[in-house]
Amino acid sequence: MASQADSLCFTDVPPIAADVARGVTRLFCRQDLFAVCEMPLPNGRRADLMAIDAKGGLTIVEIKVAKGDLIGDCKWRDYLEYCDRFFWAVPPHLAQFLEEERYLPGEAGLIVADRYDAAVIRQAAHRPLPAARRKAELLRFARRAARRLSAQIDPSLGDSN
């Protein structure tokens, strides 16, 4: 059986990124949203976290833990067509930078997190996905989550794209 370390996401990132993901996941769980980490998207991008709510709403979270990484990120708009809501998640020291217009404060939400918890500082705008896209994304999400659970039972099944 796979070891716990083999099954965890965010194993090749700075520990602070895994801490932010953990805090966001705890917050989402309290809000009845459940996340899959490092979720591949059809456009070749990979969402740090993608969560589903009880009504099938999809939320993508992009985690940033360094100012340089945040400023250099030009790909995040590519996530918007695959979710109903989009959030940035950052440690407390980066929150101020996400007020800049280029980060669409009227559209993108902001979560500040550490390894213990997280708080929504700015709510994300709700932009409902078209029905056909929603169906495709929900199916993809479910299959990815199921595949990861199957790999827990038999590691040879892996978690390939």
List where the protein language model places each region.
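Non-catalytic C-terminal interaction segments of nucleic acid-processing enzymes
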Residues: A2-L33, N43, E99, Y103-N161
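Residues in well-ordered beta-strands of folded domains
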Residues: V36, M50, I111
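Short, flexible loop segments at the rims of nucleotide/cofactor-binding pockets, characterized by
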Residues: E38-P40, E62-G68
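Catalytic cores of nucleic-acid endonucleases
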Residues: L8, V65-A113
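Flexible, charged surface loops at secondary-structure boundaries
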Residues: F28-R30, D53-A54, L80-Y82
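Amphipathic coiled-coil/heptad-repeat helices and related helical stalk/stem segments
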Residues: V20, R45, I71-K75
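Flexible, glycine-rich phosphate/dinucleotide-binding loops
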Residues: L58, A95, D117-A119
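Active-site beta-strand-loop-beta-strand hairpin of nuclease catalytic cores
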Residues: N43, A47-I60
